[in-house]
Structures are given as C-alpha cells and as structure tokens.
Regions:
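Alpha-helical structural motif
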Residues: 5, 100, 104, 169-173
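Charged, low-complexity surface segments at secondary-structure and domain boundaries
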Residues: 27, 88-94, 161-163
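Short, charged N-terminal helix-start/capping segments
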Residues: 17-21, 25, 124-134, 176
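Internal alpha-helical transmembrane segments
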Residues: 1-49
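Membrane-proximal low-complexity regions enriched in glycine and acidic/polar residues
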Residues: 41-142
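Extended, hydrophilic extramembrane loops/domains of integral membrane proteins
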Residues: 108, 112-118, 131-182
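N-terminal membrane-entry
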Residues: 186-187
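Juxtamembrane/interface motifs at transmembrane-helix termini
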Residues: 35, 53, 179-181
Length: 187
C-alpha cells in the first residue's frame, strides 16, 4: 500500500510540475529572438487595417525599441507605425498649441495615462509621437491595461490607438504569458 501511494504521488507531482515547466517554456520562448520573432509574432501581430484611413509608415513598432528595452507590447512589434502629415485622426493636442513633448505629455494625462508610461518622440519627418504603457516595458503589472497611442507630429491629432482589448487572441495570450513568466502579473 505504501509503495503504491509513493508511485501515485510521484506521478501526480511529475505531471503538475511538467505542466508548470511547459507553461514557463512556452511563455519564455514567445518573446525570445528566434522562436518568438520568427514564429510567434507573425501569428499574433496587431492588424494595422483596424486603423481606418491612417497612412502607414514603412517603419514598424519594433524600431521604437532602444538598447534591447521594449517600449511597446510584443503583439505590436511587427505592425507598421502610422505616418504623420496626413491631417486625419481624432482631436488630440488642442488647435493653436504647438505639438511638442510638453503638449503630448499633457494629452497623455488627458487620455488617462497615469503612473509610469513612455513617450517616444518622432525620429523621422513622418514619425509620430508614441505614448505607451505596457507590461513588456515594466510600466504596468496588468497586461489587460496595455495601451499605445500615436499622435501626429504636425497636427497633434490622435492617429491610432491599440489597447489590450483590440489585440488578436494570440497577442492577448502572449501579453498575459510574458507577464506571468516574468512574475509581473498583478503587481
């Protein structure tokens, strides 16, 4: 009777430990350079077609990552950035005000960005201001609060917004999985 109990315990512990280790393996690989970048991200990239009538740049969100520190969610990295200069978009920086870091920071606060978030300044003539708060960059502990907003550098209009609710199913799973893997979920 004792030996059967130990065998059963060993099998149960082994099964559940294997499940946890498999979860860590899959969530870790989802943002690794080769497996994540070549296989996972193309499956779960945010569809830029959701941004109606917004001209897109040749640059992707991955270009916003500097020195290996991500500032946008992994599900957006392969998605093209919007391009400034078209005059489209929703009201952002009030008319008559210059579009600069100060007015974009005020807009971020008005849009509900509180606490830690990033504002990326445009790097090219068609570049955009990008306001983001997400778990990949350590801004948030809850991936369901991930949010990225793009602002036209000339007009101050909001060109595009991507939030967790807009992500495809696999991008949602990747965002939650990475936060879980890093121990950030819920902090």
């Amino acid at each position: 009777k004792g030996r059967l109990w130990w065998r059963s315990l060993h099998a149960s512990v082994g099964f559940w430990l294997s499940a946890v280790l498999l979860m860590f393996l899959l969530t870790g690989l989802s943002w690794a350079g080769i497996w994540g970048g070549k296989f996972v991200q193309p499956w779960n990239s945010f569809p830029a077609a959701k941004w109606d009538a917004v001209p897109l740049s040749d640059a992707t969100h991955a270009t916003l990552t500097a020195a290996g520190q991500p500032v946008v969610p992994g599900g957006l990295e392969k998605t093209p950035l919007p391009a400034s200069g078209s005059g489209v978009g929703a009201v952002g920086v009030p008319a008559g005000q210059p579009v600069n870091l100060d007015t974009v920071a005020a807009l971020a606060k008005q849009l509900g960005f509180a606490g830690q978030h990033h504002i990326q300044v445009p790097q090219t003539a068609t570049g955009v201001f990008t306001i983001s708060a997400d778990t990949m960059s350590g801004d948030l502990g809850n991936p369901t609060q991930d949010r990225t907003v793009h602002v036209d550098r000339y007009s101050g209009r909001v060109l595009a917004e991507a939030a967790f609710a807009d992500y495809p199913l696999l991008a949602k799973a990747m965002a939650v999985g990475i936060a879980l893997h890093q121990g950030d979920l819920g902090l």
